[in-house]
């Protein structure tokens, strides 16, 4: 600054408005270099008294300012070095005054209220940084307390990386994210306006970066390899060893926070992919057993390798199914599981199919019809369920090419073993029947009489979901059990034959007789049973306080309307059509399993609405029929030539006719069982899973035939519980910390947790995350996920041992730190904050 600039600057300084109760301006100017010692006498600033401070007049100066002249503005000039506060006679005056300096570092220090002269070299290092008002403002906004050299460096880095807190972890993430975006602007700004060496010194201090080359990519590689090394069970090759940091814990915590941050994890994904390719992680994994890296989730390729290996083992026919399921279970709580959740679940359900085949010794037993029905509802249905769940998840896979061979295995087992074996044995058992009715099995056409008619004053809601199979209802029953306070039970009945909508819907209505006229309309007590209006009339014939209505109409009703509509009624039939609507359409039949999941959600929404809006206490969910579905194309050998009928109704799975014909590959039943003796109507259905040839596409989803999948119709009975009793309340299992100690003495520590009870009806799983934080809520450890879903009676199998890695930092043993345990699926769910003391004397990665 030249003399005129100084005069102008001082003039502005003394002209500033007074604040904080001040009556005048006092400014100190230490000119140690004596650059202006000869000019000070020529300074003539209006209303400013200039005092020259030297070694001998400090006491006089103090006396003059405080006693003799208490009104004028004063400039105290000294050609001495600025004294330390403890050696400064005038420090009390200086502390409430302003300081003028011709060097930028001093000006900035004074502005920031930094009075330690030992820090001046650090500020001088950043002269270029402090030339910009925006950068100064960003630095000020960090509100740094108790300045140190390191805090200055971190503050500069935070300002340049646009991080608003003093956190080296956040600074590094910002630099990495910018680098991954291809910009690298933040790092260039550090080189231009900051101190590149200071950054790398901090990376060495906190993360152990020891390479000579200042490389962001090497640093990222070090973080990831160090983390990998902590969770694998084999020794890394020599070429990887330089990338293993000695500051293990900070690297582990950094990566854990990075991948678990919702706003940052997309950058983590890009980072790990970049590094995995560079250091050839795939080649490394090929040399080792899956068990040796089963708990490592640092690189996405690990999940791909594990999935590929399990698929290969399954396709090769190796039957170690429990081991494969345990592999999938282990991966559930790890980072990339959610990305590949559909693949993992598809594989799980494929394993369940294969495992069930193994449990059955690859054999479906020959039994009488009644026993076959019992075997189906107890064990065989599970294969249909597993097939449905496999395809539901397979259709959502992003990695279909890799899983398509497993699909072939599933198709082979389901079609060529299960459906074929089951249909052969079932056809054999029903061939002995004199009538379609199986003794001892509830009948669909007696549904109203047995479930509705004698309910007395209790209003009953019946939800009829078109195409809801028994295997699907088993899952829905579990969902209802765990959705609401109440009791839900599953039963079954033998559906009518042919198993198609027109007849199944009629069978569920109250009736004295069912007829099929010459046009093959189904009449209930002489009323055509097709359509909601006709069904409403049939219901009212039995009980005038009845109503038939569609699902969509109910769901569209406002609260007042639904209460008014249902007021005074005894019986409400609600017709729901999601599964059959999608399955029975050639363009959407592939979506039938997704439609089933949609149906679950819709039915649960309906149940909730009925309970909450009209206080429904008794709800029944049933169906008109089931269906057969296979994903693979129908073979020509599985199609029967179409039959021309003089009269009748036909479909891919049945012929309904007045002609009692013998057709090869079919089985025939008289309709007398339903229509009454002398009906002169017959149902002809292909044996097994064969279809009649019919023009057009859409042969994969069919119903109308006599298979167990088509004709075992579910009955779910849900009783809502409005009592104060807790018997039917739904609760999550509790996962509690069981470790007794509340003192941590090692930077790596293990804690034990316990699932308090097994999973069962009304007791559902809980997924929690747990981590340590300080009093201000800053995370200081990695995050662990615990999934409490064990069904075991054995307490040992409900115990979890989790590894916690603390940041390498100074801990205050007089302060409290907290283990946070919180529900990972519900922000309003379970939360616990358990106080701990951390007493680690000298911090390194071994805790000593």
Predicted regions and their residues:
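Beta1/beta-strand and adjacent pyrophosphate-binding region of the FAD-binding site
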Residues: 463
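…; additionally, a secondary subgroup of soluble metalloenzymes is captured
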Residues: 1-459, 469-619, 623-848
């Amino acid at each position: 600054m030249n003399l005129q600039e100084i005069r102008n600057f001082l003039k502005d300084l003394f002209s500033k408005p007074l604040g904080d109760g001040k009556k005048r301006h006092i400014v100190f100017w230490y000119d140690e270099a004596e650059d202006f010692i000869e000019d000070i006498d020529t300074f003539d600033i209006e209303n400013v008294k200039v005092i020259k401070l030297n070694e001998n007049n400090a006491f006089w100066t103090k006396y003059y300012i405080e006693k003799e002249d208490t009104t004028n503005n004063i400039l105290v000039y000294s050609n001495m070095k600025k004294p330390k506060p403890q050696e400064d006679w005038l420090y009390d005056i200086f502390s409430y005054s302003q300081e003028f300096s011709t060097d930028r570092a001093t000006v900035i220090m004074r502005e920031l209220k930094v009075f330690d002269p030992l820090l001046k070299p650090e500020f001088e290092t950043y002269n270029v940084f402090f030339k910009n008002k925006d950068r100064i403002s960003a630095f000020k906004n960090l509100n740094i307390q108790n300045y140190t050299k390191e805090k200055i460096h971190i503050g500069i880095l935070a300002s340049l990386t646009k991080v608003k807190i003093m956190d080296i972890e956040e600074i590094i993430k910002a630099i990495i994210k910018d680098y991954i975006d291809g910009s690298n602007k933040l790092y260039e700004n550090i080189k231009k306006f900051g101190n590149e060496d200071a950054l790398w010194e901090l990376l060495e201090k906190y993360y152990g970066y020891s390479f000579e080359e200042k490389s962001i990519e090497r640093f990222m590689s070090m973080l990831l390899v160090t983390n990998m090394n902590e969770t694998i069970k084999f020794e890394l090759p020599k070429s990887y060893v330089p990338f293993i940091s000695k500051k293990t814990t900070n690297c582990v915590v950094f990566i854990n926070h990075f991948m678990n941050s919702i706003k940052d994890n997309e950058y983590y994904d890009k980072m790990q992919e970049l590094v995995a390719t560079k250091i050839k992680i795939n080649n490394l994994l090929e040399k080792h057993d899956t068990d040796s890296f089963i708990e490592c989730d640092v690189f996405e390729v690990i999940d791909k390798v594990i999935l590929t290996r399990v698929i290969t083992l399954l396709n090769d026919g190796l039957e170690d199914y429990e081991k494969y399921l345990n592999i999938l279970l282990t991966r559930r709580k790890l980072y990339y599981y959610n990305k590949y959740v559909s693949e993992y679940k598809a594989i799980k359900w494929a394993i369940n199919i294969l495992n069930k085949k193994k449990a059955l010794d690859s054999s479906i037993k020959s039994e009488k019809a009644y026993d076959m029905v019992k075997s189906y509802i107890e064990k065989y249905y599970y294969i249909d369920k597993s097939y449905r769940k496999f395809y539901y998840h397979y259709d959502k896979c992003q990695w279909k090419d890799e899983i398509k061979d497993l699909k072939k295995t599933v198709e082979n087992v389901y079609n060529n073993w299960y459906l074929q074996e089951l249909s052969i044995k079932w056809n054999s058992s029903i061939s002995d029947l004199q009538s379609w009715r199986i003794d001892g099995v509830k009948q669909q056409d007696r549904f109203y009489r047995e479930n509705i008619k004698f309910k007395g004053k209790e209003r009953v809601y019946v939800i009829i979901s078109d195409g809801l199979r028994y295997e699907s209802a088993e899952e829905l029953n579990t969902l209802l059990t765990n959705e609401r306070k109440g009791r839900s039970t599953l039963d079954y009945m033998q559906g009518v034959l042919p198993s198609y909508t027109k007849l199944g819907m009629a069978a569920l209505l109250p009736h004295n007789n069912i007829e099929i006229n010459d046009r093959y309309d189904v009449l209930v007590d002489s009323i055509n049973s097709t359509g909601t209006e006709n069904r409403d009339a049939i219901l009212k014939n039995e009980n005038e306080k009845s109503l038939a209505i569609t699902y969509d109409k109910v769901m569209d009703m406002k609260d007042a309307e639904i209460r008014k509509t249902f007021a005074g009624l005894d019986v409400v039939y609600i017709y729901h059509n999601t599964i059959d609507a999608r399955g029975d359409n050639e363009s959407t039949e592939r979506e039938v399993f997704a439609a089933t999941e949609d149906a679950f959600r819709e039915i649960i929404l309906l149940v909730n609405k009925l309970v909450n809006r009209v206080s429904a206490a008794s709800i029944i969910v049933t169906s008109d029929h089931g269906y057969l579905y296979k994903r693979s194309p129908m073979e020509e050998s599985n199609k029967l030539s179409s039959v021309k009928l003089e009269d009748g109704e036909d479909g891919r799975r049945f012929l309904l006719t007045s002609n009692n014909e013998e057709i090869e590959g079919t089985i025939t039943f008289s309709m007398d069982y339903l229509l009454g003796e002398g009906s002169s109507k017959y149902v002809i259905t292909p044996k097994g899973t064969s279809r009649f040839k019919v023009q057009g596409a859409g042969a994969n989803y069919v119903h109308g035939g006599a298979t167990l999948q088509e004709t075992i119709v579910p009955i779910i009975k849900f009783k809502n519980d409005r009592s104060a009793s807790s018997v039917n309340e739904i609760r999550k299992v509790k996962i509690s910390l069981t470790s007794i100690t509340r003192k941590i003495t090692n930077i790596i520590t293990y804690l034990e947790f316990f699932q308090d009870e097994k999973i069962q009806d009304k007791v559902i799983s809980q997924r929690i995350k747990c981590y340590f934080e300080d009093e201000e809520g800053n995370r200081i450890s990695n995050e662990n996920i615990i999934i409490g879903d064990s069904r075991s009676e054995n307490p040992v199998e409900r115990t979890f041992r989790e590894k916690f890695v603390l940041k390498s930092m100074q801990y205050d043993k007089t302060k409290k730190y907290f283990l946070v345990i919180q529900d990972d699926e519900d922000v309003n769910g379970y939360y616990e904050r358990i106080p701990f003391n951390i007493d680690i004397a000298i911090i390194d990665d071994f805790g000593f």
